[in-house]
Amino acid sequence: MMGYEEKVSATGKTRLKILACLIVLILAAAITMLTLEIISNQKRTTTDLEAVTVALKHVSTSLANCTESTTSVHTANPRKNKESRKKIEGKSPSWVQALTTASGIILLFCIMMIFITCSWTTEKDTEKSEVQSYASSVETLDSLNEAIIPKTEMNV
């Protein structure tokens, strides 16, 4: 029975390999998340700069059009305001959000697996120590029995 358990259970080296792979996955997911956040922030910054540029152009054209009739200025404003609102909102693309979410899920999965692998290690270590302590206590009892009752008297 003990031979079967040794074949089925992972060795210490295998556990270390699993932990190393999980740590590499964590680093990859974290780097991916940081990169995606940087990309989305750059996109927002670019969008903000474009919105400011559009607003400045709108102001300059409004000042130039002051000499024209007020109806033409009012009809031009709603279109430009809608364009500037769209650019100001500037949400990050959906693929960036999807990749960030996927990276977060991978990160959480890796952290859970590290905890599980570490608990396997501690369980196996405690089982080994319990078996060793049991064996040493049996040896101690045998030696005490021999000291108290010599073998010649036990055979009688």
UniProtKB/Swiss-Prot annotation:
Keywords of the record: Host membrane, Membrane, Transmembrane, Transmembrane helix
Membrane topology: Multi-pass membrane protein
Zinc recorded as keyword: no
Cellular localization per UniProt: Host membrane
GO CC annotation: host cell membrane; membrane
Organism domain of life: Viruses
Residue stretches spanning the membrane: 18-38, 98-118
Name this protein carries in UniProt: Protein U91
Protein species of origin: Human herpesvirus 6B (strain Z29) (HHV-6 variant B)
